[in-house]
Swiss-Prot record:
It comes from Azorhizobium caulinodans (strain ATCC 43989 / DSM 5975 / JCM 20966 / LMG 6465 / NBRC 14845 / NCIMB 13405 / ORS 571). The gene is pdxH. Catalyzes the oxidation of either pyridoxine 5'-phosphate (PNP) or pyridoxamine 5'-phosphate (PMP) into pyridoxal 5'-phosphate (PLP). This is Pyridoxine/pyridoxamine 5'-phosphate oxidase. Keywords: Flavoprotein, FMN, Oxidoreductase, Pyridoxine biosynthesis. Gene3D superfamilies: Electron Transport, Fmn-binding Protein, Chain A.
């Protein structure tokens, strides 16, 4: 027997993940696996919202915060997703790690992070990304690349000295999950699916397995 065969497996990342009784720790373990396996952006997730007419909208964003409250990403509040979340503060997320044959789905209401949280994260961003947050009128029509580069140059000159402050229209959103589903590929499409549900953060999660 090889040494690797003798090593105890982590039930949260092995085929026994269905025994987990709490989703956030399980998600954290899966994300760590993805950070070791995925070639690009293991924290990438599809964010789904709805527009004023109820038409679904989706795009890729990056997970930038995770705790037992929920999943956080940052954006321009005047962008399409920012406006949609302000008008209809509910969303869904999908993480798909192709190299691991795993998927996680998240659904729940959305809240804005505090100004202190947004300030703290903005301060960690590269300076050019901070400049871009001011220069880009996200989701609005752009005449051409030159117009964007001119806005970047103007903003760079404006903040040539000192730190770049966080724009008032730039903040984070936190998805407060009421449902988190874990999916793991199995042969012949006999996949493992486990879903955790709760109506609010004050109660315990209810777990159930689902047919593939």
């Amino acid at each position: 027997m090889s040494d690797s065969a003798m090593e105890p497996q982590n039930p949260l990342t092995s085929g026994d993940f269905t025994a987990a009784d709490e989703p956030f720790r399980l998600f954290s373990e899966w994300l760590k696996d993805a950070e070791r396996s995925e070639p690009n952006d293991p924290n990438a997730m599809t964010l789904a919202t709805v527009d004023p007419d109820g038409l679904p909208d989706a795009r890729m964003v990056l997970l930038k915060g995770l705790d037992d409250r929920g999943f956080v990403f940052y954006t321009n509040t005047e962008s399409a997703k920012g406006r949609e979340l302000t008008a209809h503060p509910k969303a869904a997320l999908v993480f798909h790690w192709k190299s691991l044959r795993r998927q996680v789905r998240v659904r729940g209401p959305v809240e804005r992070v505090t100004d202190a949280e947004a300030d703290a994260y903005f301060a960690t961003r590269p300076r050019l990304s901070q400049i871009g947050a001011w220069a880009s009128q996200q989701s609005r029509p752009l005449e051409g690349r030159f117009a964007l580069e001119a806005a970047v140059a103007t903003t760079t000159a404006r903040y040539a000295v000192g730190s770049v402050p966080r724009p008032p229209h730039w903040t984070g959103f936190r998805i407060l999950p009421v449902q988190i589903e874990f999916w793991h590929d199995r042969p012949f499409r006999l996949h493992d699916r486990v879903v955790f549900k709760r109506e609010n953060p004050e109660i315990d999660w209810e777990k159930s397995r689902l047919y593939p």
